[in-house]
A protein has these predicted regions:
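Surface-exposed amphipathic alpha-helical tracts and adjacent flexible/coil segments at the periphery
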Residues: 1-19, 23-33, 49, 55-83, ...
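Glycine-rich, positively charged N-terminal anion/phosphate-binding segment
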Residues: 34-51
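Beta/alpha (TIM)-barrel catalytic core signal, keyed to glycine-rich beta->alpha loops juxtaposed to Asp/Glu
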Residues: 117
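Conserved nucleotide-cofactor-binding alpha/beta core module
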Residues: 121-122
Length: 370
């Protein structure tokens, strides 16, 4: 089983390679489903191809949006240059563009994006006839649905195992376009589903905001057993630490080591198993829609009782009882109740002396941003 990792820029690319990613997906500036990512110039992409190939990894270019005639014509000389340079695969959403690529660059691998919403083996086998090599299945499929597809096709399958979930099917959502004039199907989603809304009865909540997906040891083992070729880490908009820690986490799971030690410190909106087992309200997070990280303490009187160790230099966020973000700070000098000596660390179950905003109930620590 291979790990397909994201890279939003060169720094994150190096991080993915260091974490032993087998395949890296990345985008050109101005194209693909993550236009707001930093992305790559042609020269940077060629540099990445060289670096990856020397280390036994492969590079996939994301052109996974609806394409216009002008964009197809504009991209031709760039793709020809990258094709001749050794680009391994192109990830697409647009069927017409896939046909164009197959005719003009016959030896390039064509992968079907999750944006295509290919949810049955009949369509997958049809796409194979059209020259597709691999399909990235929708996040919205359960394990039983994935298993049925695997039993009825020999197409390479790629499964998302971490990252953001969409309130709609990816590639079929018009909410951002309707509300803010930014099409999620053209790489410019404004994520209005992450906003707080109010019902006609006055109740406020993040009604449309799903938790982030994170598969564990059992889920990866099940996917290995049915013969899924690749697992995919979401995150071209995520930072270096997120890419490195998440890829390392899945490498451990593939190697049979069950661990989750750093995942709750990374960017997340709370975790769920997504649609792997079922589709119910456990997928949703109505309390907050932003990165919280790892809960490490709770206000007890005038101090904070620690649920985890905390170290000088850690960044923390203060959160109210209804999970409103009240701001954050970096931990400087460590002051612990009934402890006089200077320390760089406070331990689990100790009471930390720390100024915090009025209304604070919890403190969270995070090491990843987006």
């Amino acid at each position: 089983m291979k790990i397909v990792a994201p890279a939003g820029n060169m720094e994150r690319f190096y991080s993915a390679i260091s974490a032993t990613a087998d395949e890296i997906y990345l985008g050109l500036k101005g194209f693909g489903a993550r236009r707001n990512a930093e992305n790559f110039t042609v020269e940077e992409l060629k540099k990445a191809i060289d670096y990856a190939h020397l280390r036994g990894s492969r590079i996939f270019l994301t052109l996974n949006t609806i394409m216009t005639n002008r964009e197809i014509e504009l991209l031709y000389p760039t793709l020809k240059e990258l094709y001749n340079y050794g680009l391994d695969a192109i990830i697409v959403q647009d069927l017409g563009y896939a046909e164009y690529l197959h005719k003009n660059f016959p030896s390039i691998e064509i992968h079907g994006s999750t944006q295509m919403t290919v949810a049955n083996h009949y369509e997958i086998n049809y796409l194979k006839e059209l020259g597709f090599k691999r399909i990235v299945l929708p996040r919205e499929l359960s394990f039983e649905e994935i298993k049925e597809i695997r039993e009825n096709t020999d197409m390479e399958l790629e499964i998302f195992v971490s990252g953001s979930l969409c309130i709609s099917f990816s590639g079929n959502c018009y909410m951002s376009s309707f509300i803010g004039g930014r099409s999620g199907n053209r790489g410019m989603c404004a994520q209005p589903c992450r906003k707080e809304y109010k019902t006609s009865c006055g109740e406020k909540s993040y009604f449309l905001s799903p938790k982030d997906q994170l598969y564990g040891f059992d889920e990866i083992k099940k996917l290995q057993e049915i013969g899924v070729e690749s697992i995919k880490v979401e995150g071209r908009m995520k930072d270096v630490s997120y890419v490195y820690e998440t890829v390392s986490y899945f490498r451990s799971l593939i190697n049979g080591i069950d661990k989750e030690e750093n995942t709750h410190k990374l960017f997340n909106r709370g975790y769920s198993k997504g649609y792997f087992y079922n589709n119910d309200k456990a997928i949703m997070n109505r309390d907050y829609s932003y990165n919280m990280g790892e809960k490490i303490g709770e206000v007890l009187g005038k101090n904070i009782r620690l649920d985890e160790d905390i170290v000088s230099g850690d960044g923390v966020t203060f959160v109210s009882k209804d999970y409103k973000n009240l701001g954050g700070t970096y931990i400087g000098k460590i002051n612990v109740v009934n402890v006089k000596e200077d320390r760089k660390i406070a331990y689990k179950n100790e009471k930390l002396i720390l100024n915090f905003p009025e209304g604070t109930k919890y403190i969270f620590r995070k090491i990843g941003r987006a």
